[in-house]
From Swiss-Prot:
<dbReference type="Pfam" id="PF01967">
    <property type="entry name" value="MoaC"/>
</dbReference>
<dbReference type="InterPro" id="IPR036522">
    <property type="entry name" value="MoaC_sf"/>
</dbReference>
<feature type="binding site">
    <location>
        <begin position="75"/>
        <end position="77"/>
    </location>
    <ligand>
        <name>substrate</name>
    </ligand>
</feature>
<dbReference type="InterPro" id="IPR047594">
    <property type="entry name" value="MoaC_bact/euk"/>
</dbReference>
<keyword id="KW-0501">Molybdenum cofactor biosynthesis</keyword>
<dbReference type="InterPro" id="IPR002820">
    <property type="entry name" value="Mopterin_CF_biosynth-C_dom"/>
</dbReference>
<comment type="pathway">
    <text>Cofactor biosynthesis; molybdopterin biosynthesis.</text>
</comment>
<feature type="binding site">
    <location>
        <begin position="113"/>
        <end position="114"/>
    </location>
    <ligand>
        <name>substrate</name>
    </ligand>
</feature>
<comment type="subunit">
    <text>Homohexamer; trimer of dimers.</text>
</comment>
<comment type="similarity">
    <text>Belongs to the MoaC family.</text>
</comment>
<comment type="function">
    <text>Catalyzes the conversion of (8S)-3',8-cyclo-7,8-dihydroguanosine 5'-triphosphate to cyclic pyranopterin monophosphate (cPMP).</text>
</comment>
<feature type="active site">
    <location>
        <position position="128"/>
    </location>
</feature>
<dbReference type="GO" id="GO:0061799">
    <property type="term" value="F:cyclic pyranopterin monophosphate synthase activity"/>
</dbReference>
<dbReference type="InterPro" id="IPR023045">
    <property type="entry name" value="MoaC"/>
</dbReference>
<keyword id="KW-0456">Lyase</keyword>
<dbReference type="InterPro" id="IPR050105">
    <property type="entry name" value="MoCo_biosynth_MoaA/MoaC"/>
</dbReference>
<dbReference type="GO" id="GO:0006777">
    <property type="term" value="P:Mo-molybdopterin cofactor biosynthetic process"/>
</dbReference>
Length: 162
């Protein structure tokens, strides 16, 4: 692994110059989970949450999160995203919800941060919409699962658990 790219020779933070990089298709997939009480899970599953369609609102929030990443993470480049796909998987065994986001662009830098931000914002929205009945929900295991494109090539998480 190379050194930290967001610091110059003097140790000052800077936005990485991607001007000389090749434009390629960039894809990143991130995943995260929110664990909750069985009663909270049932409200989401059955569509009975007082604030409405929890996963529908969380899907829109995740998409917005991906689009606004450069506004939130200081050294991220603003990107023209070509696709943001959000999937929620209900898991009775936890109980909880998994959020999987795939982000794509055609550009000079990757979209891992956009995918991670989207997952976090989606799961935070689930928390926000359900906190009145379950303040003990836990957001966990947020990670990049796969990235494709760019100079460093393709990468996939070694574990297959998520």
């Amino acid at each position: 692994m190379s050194g930290l790219t967001h610091f110059d020779a003097s140790g000052h933070a800077h936005m990485v110059d991607v001007g000389g990089k090749q434009e390629t298709q960039r894809i990143a997939i991130a995943r995260g989970t929110i664990r909750m009480l069985p009663a909270t899970f049932a409200l989401i599953r059955d569509g009975k949450a007082k604030k409405g369609d929890v996963l529908g609102v969380a899907r829109i929030a995740a998409i917005q999160g991906a689009k606004r990443t450069a506004d939130l993470i200081p050294l991220c480049h603003p990107l023209a995203l070509t696709r943001v796909a959000v999937d929620f998987e209900l898991d009775d065994a936890l109980p909880g919800v998994h959020c999987v986001v795939q982000v794509e662009t055609f550009g000079r830098t990757g979209v891992e941060m956009e995918a991670l931000t989207a997952v976090q914002v989606g799961l935070l929205t689930v928390y926000d919409m359900c906190k009145a009945v379950d303040r003990g929900m836990v957001i966990t295991d947020v990670s990049v699962r796969e990235k494709r494109g760019g100079k460093s090539g393709d990468w996939k998480a070694e574990d297959t658990a998520g």
